[in-house]
Amino acid sequence: MSLKQNSSNLTKFNNSRLVKALSSLLFLFLIFSLAFSPVEGKSKKSLYFPPKGDSWEKRKPEDLGMDSKLLQEAVEFALKNEWKGPKDLKKAIENSFSRESFFSIIGPTKERGETNGIVIRNGYVVAEWGDTERVDMTFSVTKSFLSTVAGLALDAGLIRDVQEPVKKYVKDGKFDSEHNAKITWHHLLNQTSDWSGTLWDRQDWADRPPKGATWDKIRNRKLIEPGKNFKYNDVRVNLLAYSLLQVWRLPLPVILREKIMDRIGASSAWRWHGYENSWVLIDGMKVQSVSGGGHWGGGMFISTRDQARFGLLFLRKGNWSGKQLISQKWVSMVQVPTPVVPVYGYMWWLNTKKLRIPSAPESVYFAAGFGGNYIVVDNEHDLVIVVRWTGDLDGVINRILASIR
């Protein structure tokens, strides 16, 4: 064999070895990519999830890249900036909404506790203040739990597509009018339906009417095409809850408990209420249709720690300790901005252009309720922050984020 031929064969051999080596490296890279989560470069198996009960592991802020002194300053700021509303939440509701036509409280209420909160970093508790195990009303934070039940229905195939008209699923007349027949699940979830009607003796037009408008003008207003206008409206949110009840054929709190809350180790103390007149028959069984907030009483009554678990589930994209409880697709869907109001998704608030929480990243999304109740999910910093009865959310968030080194 000539030197030239030997050199050619050696080149082919070396090229073959190079291809094999590159293939091996590519294979290892793919395995590594699948095995590891983008969160802090940790594998899914190594991510910490708190066990059921009150033994949620605490870590020193410095162990997780935070400054304990600055974090304590955030806690002290939160304690000094409590919401100024009355402890008697029945009175607080009446003070805020009694100007509405035919207003009355028809769901349970209770006195609230002191301001409290918790900060979760990488799954661990790094700060906590006040009584975080106390069960309190959480008002419109309830909407994010309701949205989750809708996501579970989509995952289970009970809802085929959020763009389908709700009329295909609810056939008792509530979606029969020419306008209401156009309303989809998508419209109910992002509060752009402009549904017209009465539910639980509450007219859609009587919820948060424009100041100075006459009742005749409001009642006779021109309906807006579904999807064209955002209107925060608890009658229509309660309609979503009622519609989901028709789909699930079981009480929504049972669905939430079995599929989410029990599996993330939440306590058994939380409750999800409806109204005294929101009982319906489902397959011969008397079931209460729950509310999406505490506007007329009712809604979720829950502790800060249980809400933190719920927030952590969404931070982990619907996965809890290796089990996908709600699809990652749904977690992404709730964060899609509504075109007519880009700071709102599927019953989660978004921080588009930092309009809602100026101190936080634009990617932050959060549940929000009357009286200063929040569950904040910050993917960029691997944080869940739950604050109850705060008068200055941005101030609290600003100081927490300033503690990250």
Annotate each predicted stretch with a short phrase.
Residues 67, 123, 137-162, 188, ...:
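Active-site SXXK
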Residues 268, 278-294, 336-384:
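Active-site Gly/Thr loop motif
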Residues 144-148, 236-243, 296-319, 373-389:
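Active-site-proximal alpha-helical segments within enzyme catalytic domains
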Residues 156-194, 248-296:
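Active-site helix/loop module of the DD-peptidase/beta-lactamase fold
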Residues 2-5, 13, 21-24, 30, ...:
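N-terminal leader/targeting segments and the immediately adjacent pre-domain N-terminus
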Residues 125-134, 198-276, 298:
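Catalytic-site signature segments of enzymes, centered on catalytic residues
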Residues 57-58, 79, 83-108, 138, ...:
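Active-site-proximal loop and beta-strand segments within enzyme catalytic domains
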Residues 394-405:
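Short, gly/Ser/Thr-rich active-site loops of penicillin-recognizing serine hydrolases
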